Regions:
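Small/polar/charged residue-enriched interaction surfaces, especially the RNA/DNA-contacting tracks
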Residues: 1-174
Length: 174
């Protein structure tokens, strides 16, 4: 009987640990989202050779470093986080990731780009995706792997949404 009890209690412990990992990752994402946007911009500026583009990136960086600009950016990030679970349930994970990627336009420091990276880093690791998660979902994943990735994304977004609502300013509706 005690062996059965150990096996039964081991499962919730493992689930609790996974939930704690998700919560920690989501907390780190929400707490560091603006800093990650700033780091992306700094990196892009360092590698940019075209003067006009570099000037535009520097202007965006200066804006993010202001209190008002940072607050506005966090509000937009939080707004996207709050909407994303319904996007996934309505359109699917692949289409939602494509939406984030399109809205991010590969622009460093864009809230959609930062959230895309948060989701793809976490979900990609959990489902052992090779390379870019979106590409893996479209080209390689089985339907079972796609469902697992979707469930993992929704579970992470549950935590991201909670922490965004608690920690980030309300963004204006898009």
């Amino acid at each position: 009987m005690s062996r059965l009890r150990e096996e039964v209690t081991a499962v919730p412990s493992a689930l609790r640990t996974l939930e704690q990992e998700r919560a920690k990752h989501a907390w780190d994402c929400v707490q560091n989202c603006l800093n990650q946007a700033i780091q992306q911009l700094e990196s892009a500026i360092a590698h940019e050779t075209e003067p006009r583009r570099r000037e535009d990136l520097e202007k965006r960086l200066r804006n993010l470093r202001t209190e008002e600009g940072g607050k506005e950016w966090k509000g937009r990030y939080g707004s996207v986080v709050r909407k994303l679970p319904s996007y996934i349930l309505t359109n699917g994970l692949g289409q939602t990731l494509a939406f984030l990627k399109a809205k991010g336009k590969g622009e460093p420091g864009n809230e959609h780009e930062v959230l895309y990276r948060h989701l793809t880093d976490w979900v990609g690791r959990k489902v052992h995706a090779d390379g870019d998660l979106l590409s893996w979902l479209v080209n390689t994943a089985t339907s079972q792997q796609y469902r697992l990735a979707t469930m993992e994304a929704l579970a992470l977004l549950q935590w991201l949404k909670r922490f965004a609502e608690a920690e980030l300013p309300k963004g204006r509706e898009e």
